[in-house]
Amino acid sequence: SIINADDEKVTSFADKIDDLKSFTLNAPRKGQLGVVEDLIVDRAFIPNSEAEAIEIATLKDLKNAVPHTVSNALAAGALARSAGILSESIAAGLRNFEPGLHRISVVMERDEVTWINDSKATNPHAAGAALRTFQKVVWIAGGLAKGATMDDLVKTNRDRIRVALLIGQDRELIARSLAKYAPETIIERIDGLTGKEVMQNAVNRAKQICEAGDVVLLAPACASMDQFENYAERGQIFTDSVLRLE
């Protein structure tokens, strides 16, 4: 079995698993894959794992080396190594892998501000994975929550969300969680006559208030159908709006 050693819920029952291997974003111990500087290394599927590690890839092999992407690469690498796949083949596979559209895609980096399209983050869990990646965020969020609660998402990431620009039908659900658990976060509600206009207004407002070091992150934590055809349209309008900024 292969588990994520950085996940406390998973590791809480690890002692019940036979022949356990794991992966971590940190330097690996015996029986783990992990990261050393910019290398992804294996100390699990080699003869002398007590004293040695082998490189199976580098972070440069990944299209977007944010933490959860690295974690996914480690999981895939561990499965491949367990099947006897050579490290060269794993590195090639990671280099050739094309991430899905609208999933933590860097749209633009300008004036020390990074613009990220994660429109595919249609629920709190996915949005949380994106928020945890960055330190200082102007967060564009909202849409159809479909009964989801935002409390845990906000509590976990309250120190990262500098500004929240809220859109969509269930934006007040997010606003209430922010007011309760992240009272220092600036909250603004963005309106418009159409979904396209709303997103353009959100992007323009983000441009006005962003600071050096900010990440402007579209990670709505909600479905899109209240204002858009689907998450892809939402993400594309965001991308187009960002690229049109002067």
Question: Where do the PLM segments sit?
Answer:
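Nucleotide phosphate-binding/pyrophosphate-handling subdomain across enzymes
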Residues: A57-I161
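Short internal beta-strands
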Residues: S1-A5, I140-A141, R160-Q169
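C-terminal helical cap/extension that packs against the catalytic core
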Residues: L153-D214
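Short glycine-rich anion-binding loops that position phosphate/pyrophosphate groups of nucleotides
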Residues: D7-E8, I46, L144-K146, D170, ...
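Extended acidic/charged loop-beta regions that coordinate divalent cations
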Residues: T11-L59, G100-R103, V107, F134
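Short beta-strands and strand-loop turn motifs
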Residues: N4, E188, V216-A221
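Short, charged/polar "capping" segments at the starts of alpha-helices
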Residues: D7-S12, P28-K30, G147-A148, R171-R176
